Amino acid sequence: MSISLGNAFIKNFLGKAPDWYKIAILSFLVINPLVFFFVDPFTAGWLLVVEFIFTLAMALKCYPLQPGGLLAIEAIAIGMTSPEQVKHELVANIEVLLLLVFMVAGIYFMKQLLLFIFTKILIGIKSKTALSVAFCFTAAFLSAFLDALTVIAVVISVAVGFYAIYHRVASGQGGSQTHDHTCDSDVDELTREDLEDYRAFLRSLLMHAGVGTALGGVMTMVGEPQNLIIADQAGWMFGEFIIRMLPITAPVFICGILTCIAVEKLGICGYGAKLPENVRKILEDYEAEERKNRTNIDNAKLIIQGLIAVWLIVGLALHLAAVGLIGLSVIILATAFTGVIEEHSMGKAFEEALPFTALLAVFFAVVAVIIDQELFKPIIDAVLAVEDKGAQLALFYVANGLLSMVSDNVFVGTVYINEVKAALMDGVITRDQFDLLAVAINTGTNLPSVATPNGQAAFLFLLTSALAPLIQLSYGRMVWMALPYTIVLALVGMFGIIFFLEPMTAMFYDLGWIAPGTIESATSAISSGH
């Protein structure tokens, strides 16, 4: 049946996305300029933020790059922000972009080692609760020294490997190397229930690991990009940063691990799914088969990948180079010493991260609108105007948390620390209050932001990864599964800010672990970030 040219244009627009979704995006594109020019640029700015969140929430209907990109292009075209401001945002976040381009590809070339290690862990630990705690704790520990995105890239890589192994067998193609694990049409009805249970099992492990990256990432100055910016503004070194955060991070970490145990035991919010016995048998058979067929060439590859893993951890922990450049070194070393020298063999490694890199560039265009239209200014001004110091600390934590749920936590943390730094330099607040506020900003941007994928880049990467549709992990499901953690982390963090922060900081001063800061010790350079 032939189709008219007009209908062909409509059908091609956003491809297989539902018609209602296409109409919604077109409506946004019509409404935004009208609101910007005839109502109020501030309102139009917030409208754009809400619309962009909508495209993220519908990630399984349509990858957010296309609809979000159209909204961003229009925003620049009508003057909500400028190409220069977008470029400034991209330059300021070049390390994150390099990380996505190179580090995620680097992890791809270490798949064999990761599957080897994690298969042993998955088969070795029979208790789902113990396994969940192991994933959460390991992710937290690694995120304290590495980047959360790198940790999530590792976990995603492992989960895709596990999923593909079972899916191949469930589809009756156990020996096939070219099996398509994204297609369920060959899955036997008897194994379909196991497949659903297995998906739920993998979803819960991924969410535990995702929250683990937030629990660990808040603790050290290298854990998250905004931590580095905050530490730089306050003039804190690695050890001092950890100690200053302890009144909040220690109780939050303990309660986070307890939450991990509780949700698994109670089976709430999508947790509690156990590894089906049939799947365990398949993974055990796979492991035995791999062990039997492993040659010296395979062993040599595993040894090389192990040595590269050591370099990766040492390089990142000591910050020997930008994360992305260390990732590039991993690609070069892993391919050179394992014999991957064809261009098409290398291309697959970049497939996972490049669409997300493009999406992040669009995200920074939205951040540019937030800056140019001063969308957060009323909130920041209101919090800074509060006289009571204790209330100001709590409000900073809450305001940071709420804004980090809708925007990038790096951006929110940077904006706030720069505003507080300006207040310190103008004599509006004391150095002691500045130090306490810096802790409130750091914990506020890192902890409550687990509520939605917008706040944590690692969560956003997980949501838009090739793995998410395989295990049916949608935006709504992520928010629902993160809910127990969001409540516990946000409330315990708030409790720590109100009751523990001031007395414990004073105690650390008395013990001589840290010294009270002076205005001179805070670096005067406003971060190059924003």
Swiss-Prot record:
Compartments where located: Cell inner membrane
Regions crossing the membrane: 13-33, 34-54, 90-110, 121-141, 145-165, 205-225, 241-261, 306-326, 351-371, 393-413, 455-475, 481-501
Catalytic activity: 2 Na(+)(in) + 3 H(+)(out) = 2 Na(+)(out) + 3 H(+)(in)
GO CC terms of this entry: plasma membrane
Disulfide linkage: none
Example GO molecular function: sodium:proton antiporter activity
UniProt KW keywords: Antiport, Cell inner membrane, Cell membrane, Ion transport, Membrane, Sodium, Sodium transport, Transmembrane, Transmembrane helix, Transport
Transport keyword on record: yes
Coiled coil start-end: none
Membrane-topology annotation of the record: Multi-pass membrane protein
Taxonomy, superkingdom: Bacteria
Alphabetical list of HAMAP family matching this protein: NhaB
Family: Belongs to the NhaB Na(+)/H(+) (TC 2.A.34) antiporter family.
Function (record text): Na(+)/H(+) antiporter that extrudes sodium in exchange for external protons.
Protein name, per record: Na(+)/H(+) antiporter NhaB
The organism of origin for this protein: Aliivibrio fischeri (strain ATCC 700601 / ES114) (Vibrio fischeri)
